[in-house]
Structures are given as structure tokens and as C-alpha cells.
């Protein structure tokens, strides 16, 4: 409706000196002309420019209809065909295919002639198909991409397929063949069709103190989001709906209302679907196509290791807190380090270590820390006037051992953020659904097993790394600081995609760092 109103107002705001904008409507009302004749005449003057089409769009339309000898795509004798009616419905729901509504040209008013509707439908279909294959955000510059159209020849070729498949199906076939993209595209479409696209943000403060029953605020929110039917409600169905909702939002499906569940309930389905559109857009522009690589999706809390184009291992991870966010990066894993030293980042030294030392100097010995000057000379902490310090002027190094914050193994790759993938003494955190607890590094579950798999596949042709999985086991047993350099450096991609899917399910993970929010503001022209 917003699109229709905008366009309707546009017609009245056109300046009188812009020609005769009403002529296109006079032309389209002429019953003495065939659709083909009307289309031919439309392109002979500036009828379309006068109602908001730019020259590129007009030239594109001319080319499209020239290929078709001015035969309409969606109309016959000025009446929508079945294909036309179904396609019009498809274009009313671009978010079902992962394309934000703002990417479409303002649609003609429903009362306008079907032939004019067709012209708008062609442009919007061309825009959608271009975005589905090329993306709508430039993630390097963090700017919206300009609206573009697929080539007229490719457009007509695709439109010919509408005799055998629907426009919905045609849109779903666009984009990369990547399995993750295919699963997300299909499951987003299914979610869109199954759940009402509510725009309501619920204020569910203190809802965790209310009983879970049919009259609760929870049940009203669940009905609005399509997880409950208003008829035949029962307390059991409310609980079952809550568990399904939690599962779809990357939370533990335990029926317990905690902070993360409340945050997910407060978010509207409309916003979740918009986040899914951004996730699809990121996948379609991804450059991950190597034979061997590691990818880490921060909001999903998972590490994926691939070798020989096959998924070898999936490991749960812990990522950085909101105040110590894990960065997105691309690098190459060069070595595996057993029993690593940990050089504590300067920010942690200042914010955490220095106050703890001032409180009790035994903090250093209890945590196996040593202090060094810039020339690597060790400092006796008992001879430092800690109370007088406002900054931490030394290097703080934690000695290797199972007590070490990096655990017994780390995977090293060059980056400007001083982050790694590593083990952790805090194994219990892997059992949580939302796992943002670190200082920015990525803590990995079962990292030794991951290291052994990497070494098992570390070869150039038939020449394998002389250090084997058994070698790593021996190093761990010896509890000595040792390094294994990889024969083949492994590309690693750390990225941020909040919405994911497998074959059967879509999951809307929390936008823990509000990075999707930044792109949503950009799409709605609210970016600073």
C-alpha cells in the first residue's frame, strides 16, 4: 500500500511543463488499438519518462519488447492472463525471495491499466533477477548498490520459462548453486508463506515472571508470529509453540523464558525476514570457493573445516562479547601451536589485569603470568609501584599449561586483530546456545581432534606433512611448547551471517553485534 500511495502522489506532483503525462493514460484507454500497437506507440514519445521511468529503463523496455515484437508478457487483449495474475502476486512479496521491498520501482496503482501494470512488472522482475544474481549491498563500501536490470535477452529467455514454471519458482532458481544458499532461499520462502509477516515489536518485560498459559502475553506474541493458532489453545500448545520458536531462533528449545528468548520474541517476523535477505545477499557475493578452507560464522557459533571440497568437521565455538567483538577477517592458517604462550592484549592488561594486580599482587602467580620490559627483560612484580600506574607499561605473558587461556592448542593465522582459534579451559560454555563470552578470540571445542584432521589432510600431491596426527598427540602428552608448520596454508574466513538454514529448517540467530541492524538502516536510508 505504501508503494501505491507514493506512486499515486507522484502523478499529481509532476510539473505541468513536463509534457503531457496524461497522454499515456489516454493512449491506454484507446480500444481501437491492439496491445502491440499501444506498446509501440508508448516508446515513440516520452510517455514513460513523464511518469518516472529513467532513460536506461525505457531503453531496456524497448529492447525487451523489440525482441518480443511488442507482444505483451502478462496481458492479452488488455486483460491479465493467468501467468500475469500469478506473477503480479509474486512481485507483491519480494521479501519471500530475499529482496527488500525498497529495491523495487514504485508499482502502478491497481486501478491503472493492466498494460501499464505489465511495464512496471517487467522492470521490477528485471531488478529482482539482477539482485538475486549480483546482490544489493556493497559490503566493502557499506553502500547500497544502484538498481540495475538483467540484460534484455536473458530477461526474455527467462520469461519464456513462465509457460512451464511460476515466477516464484523462477526467482528461487536464481543465484549461486551453493548448497547453503539454496537451503536458505527455499527455507526463507517457506517461512514467509507459513508465518504472518507481523511488524509488531512486543514489550515483554518481566514476561519470565508470568506463567506460561493461554492468557499470557507470551501466547499473544506467539499467535502474532504464527507459532500458535488462536483456536483450540491449551497451555501445552503454548509450551510446544515456545519450544519451536526457540529452535527457530538459535536458542535452547527448553521452554524456559530467559533474556535471549525475550529478545527474540520482541523482534518482529518482518525484521527477521529482512535479516534473512541480508544473509542471502552475503552468500551470493561470497568468494569462498577453495578446495580446502576453514569458515567461521560468528553468530552461528560454529567452525566448518573443508578438505577436497568435502565438509570434514564442524566444531562449536565461543566468540567475543559485545564489548570485545570477534572481527570479520580473511587470512591463512600457517601453523598449529601446542601448549602456547599467551601474550595478553594491551586492552585486557589495562582494563582487567592492572586493577586485579592492584587489588592483590598474587593475581600474577595464581594465573601463571610473567612480566617483561620491551627488551624482553623479565620484571620482578614485587618491585613495581603498581598503585602509581594508570597504564600497563609491560608485556604480560601467560605461561603454557592447561591453565592457559588459550588451552593446549591454538591455530595461528596472520591478522591485525591479534585473534586466534584456540582451546579453552572453560569447556562448559560450549553447552550454551548463545556463546559470546570471549575477549575476541574464537575458542574451539575439540581443537586437538580438529588439528589431527588438518594434519591428516595436509599434503601436496602425494607428499604429506612429516608431522602426523600422532605427532600432535605426542606433543600434547609431552606438555611442551612446540609448533607444527603446515605444508599447505589453509584459507580461513571469519564472517557474520545471522540467518542460516539446513535442508529442512531456517534459524534466525540473534544479531549479537547489531551488524545486521547497520545494513537494515542503510536499506531504509537511515544510515548516518
Please report, for each region that a protein language model flagged, where it lies by residue.
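Residue-level signal for mature regions of secreted extracellular proteins and peptides
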Residues: 10-11, 434
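A sensor for short, sequence-defined functional sites
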Residues: 136, 152-171, 241
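Well-ordered beta-sheet/strand-loop patches within structured domains
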Residues: 18-53, 146, 172-252, 259-528
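Sec-dependent signal peptide recognition
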Residues: 2-9
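Cationic-aromatic interfacial patches
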Residues: 18-156
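Short loop/turn hinge sites at secondary-structure boundaries
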Residues: 98-99, 107-110, 131, 135-139, ...
